[in-house]
């Protein structure tokens, strides 16, 4: 692994920040590309010395020439593509969503083709699936049909299809990972970010209402980052999309964990009982057969780590109360 150099897009996002953190801690060189300038997620989980070891480049995945030049210039060997606009943003601006999420992904594969890089790990989504009633009861199997019901989900299906073409025509192996309900420090955007925001609110002594009820596959952000890194190092060959699984967890379980850790906040976290139109369980056995057992932080441990990190950022002044207010907005 000493000759590795990771190129990570979307590293100012939650999962990207955790990918960067893991790579820095193991001493692996990493170049990150992001169109945004905010580093508040990285500042939440990395100290200044650790951040200094990340090679930041401001850029747009929709610009193929720029992407290729950056990948070539840094000597990239391992690619983790996370840059994307999330579901609410794609709904608000489908044209921009397609440019970033589809064209941007094609550009990553094109750059890999031109530079003879033969492996990509990229973010897909459980949004590729249809509503719960479209599938039999139980965990959704690996080979279940895809019935996306949003622009965002359709873009992700397109990415998985294009990845398959790059495997068939150019021999580029790719693993598209479909996280479920990611939580943890830095998870402050997207449809399922409100459980993490509830943890931040508890740290600040503020009431908060989680925007959904029901049970879903909760996944701690650090675990998801580690799986992306492992996927980028696999010796498996082919192209496919894989669900990560996750621990089936209810919204009330999350609230109970928060209240257990911060008893004074009991009764201040509520939730909308309307469930999201997603299944709680996905069969990840095919992914496990390729990558081995996946990290799976227990809920209480993950919630505690999240609360501890946010409390520490307040105590050491790394993030101000104003910064955390922005997280809740």
Feature names for model-found ranges:
Residues 6-26:
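N-terminal Rossmann NAD(P)H-binding glycine-rich loop of SDR-like oxidoreductase domains
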Residues 58-100:
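NAD(P)H-binding glycine-rich loop region in Rossmannoid oxidoreductase-like domains
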Residues 88, 123-136, 151-157, 182-185, ...:
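Conserved catalytic-site region of short-chain dehydrogenase/reductase
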Residues 206, 211-214, 218-329:
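C-terminal substrate-binding subdomain of Rossmann-fold SDR/epimerase-dehydratase oxidoreductases
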